[in-house]
């Protein structure tokens, strides 16, 4: 398992807004964020907020027009061109949806958490999966990053 990284100064604000007890540690989140951002920047600030289904559903409804909770929402920070800030943005991750999906997809919970963090960070970096070409590129990068963490390809049937 390769975890070598370009030196990244990371300021990660982890906010826990759920009663769920099966959550990764601060160190887990930092490792996954560092892995997703490796070789892309030298300094980054972001917030990861772990929420319950109610908050996820409200945000998903407001910002995506979908009235249901979702696994991860990404909110990139867009600074004016003349301002240089290392602020990447915010990830909102719904603990109960991540747990449900891990069970449904027969994946280890920790592996699915890692995948959701990496997936969200790639969105913050500007990757998307709206069309097939973008989806293939994003999935390929995700798979490489997840496998470098010692987890299985998240898109393969388990």
UniProtKB/Swiss-Prot annotation:
Keyword hit for Hydrolase: yes
GO annotation terms (biological process): rRNA processing
Cofactor requirement: Zn(2+)
Biological role stated in the UniProt entry: Single strand-specific metallo-endoribonuclease involved in late-stage 70S ribosome quality control and in maturation of the 3' terminus of the 16S rRNA.
Cellular component annotations (GO), alphabetically ordered: cytoplasm
Positions annotated to bind Zn(2+): 119, 123, 129
Coiled coil: none
Keywords: Cytoplasm, Endonuclease, Hydrolase, Metal-binding, Nuclease, Ribosome biogenesis, rRNA processing, Zinc
GO MF assignments: metalloendopeptidase activity; RNA endonuclease activity; zinc ion binding
Localization of this protein: Cytoplasm
EC number: 3.1.-.-
Keyword rRNA processing in record: yes
NCBIfam families xrefs: rRNA maturation RNase YbeY (TIGR00043)
Main location: cytoplasm
Native source species: Shewanella woodyi (strain ATCC 51908 / MS32)
Matches recorded under PROSITE patterns: UPF0054
SUPFAM superfamilies reported for this sequence: Metalloproteases ('zincins'), catalytic domain (SSF55486)
Family recorded in the similarity comment: Belongs to the endoribonuclease YbeY family.
Name by which UniProt lists this protein: Endoribonuclease YbeY
Cofactor: binding details: Binds 1 zinc ion.
InterPro entries assigned: MetalPrtase_cat_dom_sf_prd (IPR023091), YbeY (IPR002036), YbeY_CS (IPR020549)
